[in-house]
Design a protein with these regions (language model features):
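C-terminal motif of bacterial Sec signal peptides marking the signal peptidase cleavage site
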Residues: 22-25
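Bacterial signal peptide processing site
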Residues: 27-29
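Post-signal peptide N-terminal segment of mature Sec-exported envelope proteins
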Residues: 34-54
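Noncatalytic modules at the cell exterior or secretory-pathway interfaces
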Residues: 58-66, 117-135
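Short amphipathic, basic-aromatic surface patches that mediate peripheral association
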Residues: 66-74
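Short coil-to-beta strand junction motifs in C2/discoidin
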Residues: 74-82, 141-142
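Exposed low-complexity, polar/acidic, P/S/T/G-rich flexible segments that act as propeptides
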Residues: 85, 134-152
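An anionic, turn-rich surface loop/hairpin at beta-sheet edges
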Residues: 89-120
Length: 152
């Protein structure tokens, strides 16, 4: 009798844990989220990161976020990118040098919503990202990601 009660509690606990994990993994409205690694020796200006979405999305009804994972040793407070034909300027730290975003160890991750002017009327399936910083290779950037979600 005691064993059955113990097994029932364990079964209930496993079910609850599974449900919580499932709920945490569901992000409503997100239909594309991907990070790509940058060459560990540095990001060359001609190294283009290409993101091919599984389905085309219409920019006015979606929100695009760009995410950057970088080392604390990244020597700039900002980064300039070209996304398809738009130039994007992102600040990775505030005016006194405090990194934005969160991190573990010496790696930080920060993301921000962006608006791409060239996409106002188009259906988009592919995004191409490259940096336009003067340093080449650009050191300290580990991953660049995008997240696309429907706006409510």
């Amino acid at each position: 009798m005691q064993q059955k009660k113990h097994n029932s509690i364990i079964g209930w606990g496993i079910s609850l844990l599974t449900m919580l994990i499932f709920m945490a993994s569901c992000h409503e409205g997100i239909f594309y989220h991907s990070y790509q690694p940058v060459n560990p020796t540095g990001w060359e200006q001609n190294d283009t990161l290409v993101y091919i979405c599984p389905q085309a999305w219409y920019a006015p009804s979606c929100q695009l976020e760009i995410g950057i994972r970088h080392k604390d040793s990244y020597k700039y407070r900002d980064i300039w990118l070209i996304i398809n034909t738009d130039t994007v300027h992102l600040y990775l730290s505030d005016s006194i040098g405090n990194w934005k975003g969160n991190g573990i160890g010496d790696t930080r991750q920060w993301s921000a919503p962006i608006h791409l002017n060239s996409f106002d009327q188009d259906s988009i399936k592919e995004l191409r990202i490259m940096h336009i910083m003067q340093d080449t290779p650009l050191k300290g950037i580990e991953h660049v990601g995008i997240r696309i979600k429907e706006t409510p």
